[in-house]
């Protein structure tokens, strides 16, 4: 039988877990592993260490994600909080410390988290790849030609070449990787009413147009054709450089009555009190989107729809009674869409949850998805 002194001596020779060598994995292997993880978890991973924060924003990681075909849509939301002139951006993340117990309480496990860098003014927004473009708008109550880019990989802003004309909240749409901007001018000049930004050459060029509407209520793109809804409704096909009217699809006019709309897989969806509808081109009529259990009683003065990687992101607000109606709660739902045998479209609510509490004075600027 060994003595206690001998036991202590023997134990002291055994290496402790803290002193055991743990060589770091090569960066390229770590990048390969992280590239296979959903980006929804990157904010949690960035809390691990300084090196992990660097890795989750590195260009190499996103190149690897693309190589492995692991790119995904990431939802971004822009809000105004008067009197602060600077809009604030939020993005959909997985909640940190989400556990099994919480999931059993009907929690989605998602949260709208603020990104640290703010954009300097409100503007029209579009997304191309991993970048969100903020175009024109108003700076100190004057139209602006400024174009800023939010790099969604690193959540940093940088400037792009300015437009040729100053525009106050123009219509902005993306066709074949180019940004077409129309309206928002103080002068009625059809030769300058629309211009296009080529991302590859980083240049702006005017697009000759037959009209010069100051106010544009809505604009969208279906099958490569831009639809512009103002006092007049016109269409433009960039590939053919051809202008036209809505014609047989006059019933598609969104006018002023639709609170929100989006195009998903070349199908137009819109919301107005009573529910969400989609436009059936063949019959030239609106049809109700079925299958939205739990959202049928949705009634809000502020509803936003967005294409979320082929699914629909639906955001709305509601008063918080205990706040004396001084605060709103912003909720989010993700809806998958499926074509039915009868040529209809049916939605399925994958999840919905309260995301964010905001003051009642806020303004909902927009929601869109970047690809990362």
UniProtKB/Swiss-Prot annotation:
Coiled-coil intervals, chain numbering: none
Region described as Disordered: 1-24
Domain of life per record: Eukaryota
F-box domain sequence ranges: 19-65
Gene3D superfamilies, sorted: Kelch-type beta propeller
InterPro entries in UniProt: F-box-like_dom_sf, F-box/kelch-repeat_ARATH, F-box_dom, Kelch-typ_b-propeller, Kelch_1
Swiss-Prot/TrEMBL keywords: Kelch repeat, Repeat
Biased composition (Basic residues): 1-11
Keyword Nucleus: no
Annotated Kelch repeat ranges: 131-177, 179-224, 226-271, 273-312
Pfam families: F-box (PF00646), Kelch_FKB95 (PF25210)
Keyword match Repeat: yes
Protein name from the UniProt record: F-box/kelch-repeat protein At5g49000
Organism encoding this protein: Arabidopsis thaliana
